[in-house]
Amino acid sequence: MGTSVSKPVSDDKKKGTSVSKPVKNIVLVGRSVNGICTTGNNILGQNKFGSEGAFMHCQMYSTTTPDGQMINVIKTPGMFDLSVSEDYISKEIINCLTLAEEGVHAVLFVLSMKNRITQEEEYALNTLQRIFGSKILEYLIFLLIDGEKFEAKEFEDYFPECCPEFLMRVLRFCNGRKVLFNNMTNDEGVKAEQVNQVMAHVAAISKKNDEKPYTEDMYRNIKVNTFFSLIAFI
């Protein structure tokens, strides 16, 4: 399979919107490409992701929040699909990090609450760590979609009961960073509040990491260190 990088010019740049804050690059990952696209569109406030032929490639679109925060939203393909080759995944990871020129400020792991969380999600999380290194967990936020039937408080009571131990372990490491994200709502206030919750977590991650994003150099160092570790083991 060939790879391509889609980097459209944002509508905000076209309009000449003044941006008063440093750009934040957020990457959407998960098992369901449809879920990733819908979530990305809701963060953008526009239907941008999901165009024909784009599902298997990284794409980036931009938006600016009312308070002047520019956000680059990067959609990844279904990188945790067992039918996708390791070589293809590696190339798309590089494409993703190329799009995030200043580095990745947060990784949003999109999880559907429609069905029981299974070993396939565990495999996806393990794949994420194997590709990016355990350092990526410091930038991880869980977006829990398809939970429209829940109110926030009700969900907080329900979630520990349905959450498997592997996910609880990762959540503890991530300081419990999760957002119940309603992709079906037409309420603009709810939409704005969801994005605000996500960006509050992004700000907390940046503060904890001394404003240092995850960069392509970090990724390449992880690959080099892994290689030499394997050589030493042999």
UniProtKB/Swiss-Prot annotation:
Pfam families: AIG1. One of its GO terms (cellular component) is plasma membrane. GTP binds at G30, R31, S32, V33, N34, G35, I36, C37, T38, S51, N183. The keyword DNA-binding does not apply. Keywords: GTP-binding, Nucleotide-binding. Mostly expressed in pollen. Also detected in lateral roots and radicles. InterPro entries: G_AIG1 (IPR006703), GIMA/IAN/Toc (IPR045058), P-loop_NTPase (IPR027417). GO terms for molecular function: GTP binding. Induction: Up-regulated by brassinolides. Down-regulated by 2-aminoethoxyvinylglycine (AVG), high CO(2), isoxaben, and propiconazole treatments. PROSITE patterns: G_AIG1. Residues 21-223 form the AIG1-type G domain. It comes from the Eukaryota. Belongs to the TRAFAC class TrmE-Era-EngA-EngB-Septin-like GTPase superfamily. AIG1/Toc34/Toc159-like paraseptin GTPase family. IAN subfamily. This is Immune-associated nucleotide-binding protein 2.
